[in-house]
A protein has these predicted regions:
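Alpha-helical interaction elements
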Residues: 167
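P-loop/Walker A NTP-binding region and its immediately flanking N-terminal helices
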Residues: 1-144, 154, 160, 164, ...
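Amphipathic alpha-helical segments of the small helical/lid subdomains adjacent to P-loop NTPase cores
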Residues: 170-177
Length: 177
């Protein structure tokens, strides 16, 4: 994802898959800010430019939809209408659809129409724990990224490295698995 931002070659649809708690939605939010950042640093948002500030304050250029509670065709038709409007402050309007596997068949069909002919300013990030429930017609239009759980030992090592680098004291038991 960082390389795509650095090379200004982002796609229009992504599918983030993996177990709960692996960072799919968090990465989607960071990516949404990074693609709109005026001065990205190594493919990450700078957090300081006007666009980054606007996005962190809740800009309309990043829209999150929880498909678990908004899973009907009307919500996807509403999305199809909204997608025509250009972004307010950034280069892209990013639509994050969390738990996309919860959409109804009719809603998937409405989403498919949007993915088939997306405006140049729109990016869709679909997140799911159950990719096998996504229709093949949707899957074929997305770049898929699989998220995996990080082993506890790796988390412990990384956390210790960060704390040591910051010069922070810690109890061994507090960072152990």
């Amino acid at each position: 994802l960082q390389n795509q931002i650095e090379q200004n070659a982002v796609g229009h649809a992504y599918l983030f898959t993996g177990p709960r708690g692996t960072g799919k939605t968090t990465v989607a939010r960071i990516f949404a800010r990074a693609v709109n950042c005026e001065r990205p640093v190594n493919g990450s948002p700078c957090g300081e430019c006007a666009v980054c500030r606007a996005l962190s304050e809740g800009s309309l250029d990043i829209l999150e939809i929880d498909a678990a509670s908004n899973n009907g065709v009307n919500e996807m038709r509403d999305l199809r209408e909204k997608v025509q409007y250009p972004p307010v402050s950034g280069k892209y309007k990013v639509y994050i659809v969390d738990e996309v596997h919860m959409l109804t068949d009719s809603a998937f069909n409405a989403l498919l129409k949007t993915l088939e002919e997306p405006p140049a300013h729109a990016i869709f990030i679909l997140a799911t724990t159950e990719p096998h429930k996504i229709p093949a017609t949707i899957l074929s239009r997305c770049m898929r990224l699989d998220f995996k759980l990080i082993p506890e030992e790796d988390l412990e090592t990384h956390l210790k490295r960060i704390l040591d680098g910051m010069g922070k004291e810690y109890e061994e038991e507090a960072v152990s698995a």
